[in-house]
Amino acid sequence: MAEARHAPLKDQTSVSGARVLIVEARFYDDIQDALLEGAVAELQSAGVRHDVVTVPGALEIPAAIVFALDAAERRGEPYDAVVALGCVVRGDTIHFEIVSMESARALMDLSVKRGVALGNGIITVDTDAQAWARARAGELNKGGHAAQAALTMLRMKRRLAKA
């Protein structure tokens, strides 16, 4: 199978002044550290502010996003984009499928129904080695890619709002 190549879109719409929410599941602390490092580096390089909210597992991420978005809106400090980070490693039961599919579905529903610029960095893997390969900034850097996706969606949202 050919390796997929992803090039960032060339939209130069400004994300200046943006405020990004990162919601991370700390079920695998060491892997999560790598995912978060990649996401934060990407956001810092774009010059945007970010806050981090931590939840126990991937299934809690969508609810935490809603809680945080609503609270920020009430304070008059809305978030412009969201990055979801977590790791789900396949085990011996159906739990992997439930967590993987339901967290992805809930994030998609949230993004579409609420118009949230969202990057999904919940990695779903069969082994710890696969998780590390996807989490490390020097390798596949899925945390950084999720932040980049959130910023790309924010740029599109801002550009379309001006059209």
UniProtKB/Swiss-Prot annotation:
What is catalysed by this protein?
Answer: (2S)-2-hydroxy-3-oxobutyl phosphate + 5-amino-6-(D-ribitylamino)uracil = 6,7-dimethyl-8-(1-D-ribityl)lumazine + phosphate + 2 H2O + H(+)
Taking the record's annotation, the residue ranges forming a coiled coil are none
Keyword Flavoprotein listed? The answer is no
The record's CDD domains line, in alphabetical order, gives: Lumazine_synthase-I
Alphabetical list of InterPro entries matching this protein:
LS, LS/RS, LS/RS_sf
Keyword 4Fe-4S annotated: no
Where (2S)-2-hydroxy-3-oxobutyl phosphate binds, per the record, is at D92, T93, R134
GO BP terms in the entry? riboflavin biosynthetic process
* Annotated binding of 5-amino-6-(D-ribitylamino)uracil, by residue: F27, A58, L59, E60, C87, V88, V89, N120
Gene Ontology CC, one term: riboflavin synthase complex
Signal peptide positions (record): none
Residues at the active site: H95
A single Gene Ontology MF term assigned here is: 6,7-dimethyl-8-ribityllumazine synthase activity
Give EC number(s), comma-separated. Answer: 2.5.1.78
Pathway assignment: Cofactor biosynthesis; riboflavin biosynthesis; riboflavin from 2-hydroxy-3-oxobutyl phosphate and 5-amino-6-(D-ribitylamino)uracil: step 1/2
Keyword list, A-Z: Riboflavin biosynthesis, Transferase
State the source organism's domain of life: Bacteria
SUPFAM superfamilies per the UniProt record, alphabetical: Lumazine synthase
Give the record's family classification.
Belongs to the DMRL synthase family.
* Alphabetical list of NCBIfam families matching this protein: lumazine-synth
Q: Which HAMAP family match?
A: Lumazine_synth
Role noted for this protein: Catalyzes the formation of 6,7-dimethyl-8-ribityllumazine by condensation of 5-amino-6-(D-ribitylamino)uracil with 3,4-dihydroxy-2-butanone 4-phosphate. This is the penultimate step in the biosynthesis of riboflavin.
What is the protein named? 6,7-dimethyl-8-ribityllumazine synthase
UniProt source species? Nitrobacter winogradskyi (strain ATCC 25391 / DSM 10237 / CIP 104748 / NCIMB 11846 / Nb-255)
